[in-house]
A protein has these predicted regions:
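Transmembrane-helix signature of polytopic, membrane-embedded enzymes
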Residues: 10-13, 34-61
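Transmembrane-helix motifs of polytopic, lipid-linked glycan transferases
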Residues: 17-44, 84
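Specific aromatic-rich, kink-prone transmembrane helix
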Residues: 33-36, 77-95, 104-109, 126
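Membrane-interface transmembrane helices that cradle and orient dolichyl/undecaprenyl
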Residues: 39-46, 85-102, 112, 134-140
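Short acidic/glycine- and proline-prone juxtamembrane loop motifs at membrane-interface regions
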Residues: 64-77
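Perimembrane helix-loop-helix junctions
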Residues: 91-94, 122-161, 185
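Membrane-interface alpha helices of multi-pass inner-membrane proteins
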Residues: 101-117, 123, 128, 162
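Membrane-lumen/periplasm interface segments of specific transmembrane helices
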Residues: 132, 151-199
Length: 199
């Protein structure tokens, strides 16, 4: 956004406003996926429309969610990833692990991998959720469940790696193998943080 804005505006304070647009769009996308997930979690046959919207409103109007959409940081990207993954899980509950839901889960996991590493708990939970729902909740023979697990799981892993692997490889090359950037983050904190906040 900032590079595009340089074509139309002078550098300065307006650049900060424009840089925030990415975060505004990420949080808007997160609210969109939470609204979609609420439709799956609270179907209209059992729940009123107010219940579905209350769930979405509680998530979308949390002060933290609103705050994340107003400043320049990747917290909002992690929020978008969490909402996408939640929607994939909710879609599984209604439709099983269709190809569409598997791809959606993979895209959500890739977005999560591109955000903060403290959001990686969603990746771990997605792995266990997928494995447990395939192995324990399907009614076919166990050998077919295992085959289904590896065939769909391989596609999920491949799509996730294609979408986010380039970033991790780039980081490993730039930061001497530190593909998550933890060592680099600690070095910057040591260099720039105030005395009492240094690691």
């Amino acid at each position: 956004f900032m590079r595009i804005s340089r074509l139309f505006a002078d550098p300065g304070y307006s650049m900060f406003k424009i840089a925030r647009m990415a975060d505004v769009l990420f949080v808007t996308g997160a609210v969109y996926f939470v609204v979609k997930a609420s439709g799956k979690l609270f179907p209209k046959e059992k729940y009123s429309r107010e219940v579905r919207w209350l769930f979405a409103a509680l998530a979308g109007f949390m002060p933290q969610a609103i705050f994340m959409g107003t400043y320049v940081n990747t917290d909002s990207l992690a929020l978008l990833a969490a909402a996408m993954i939640l929607y994939a899980w909710a879609s599984y509950l209604r439709e099983d692990w269709t190809w569409k839901n598997c791809i959606l889960l993979a895209v959500g996991m890739a977005v999560c991998a591109l955000s903060y590493y403290n959001a990686y708990g969603w990746l771990l939970c997605s792995f266990f959720f997928f494995c447990f729902t395939v192995l324990l909740c399907r009614e076919e023979a166990f050998s077919q469940r295992v085959r289904f697990l590896f065939s769909r799981g391989a596609v999920i892993a491949a799509v996730t790696l294609v979408l986010c692997g380039w970033w991790l490889i780039r980081n490993a090359g730039l930061y001497n193998g530190d593909f998550l950037g933890r060592k680099s983050c600690a070095e910057c904190a040591e260099k720039y943080a105030q005395k009492y906040y240094r690691p």
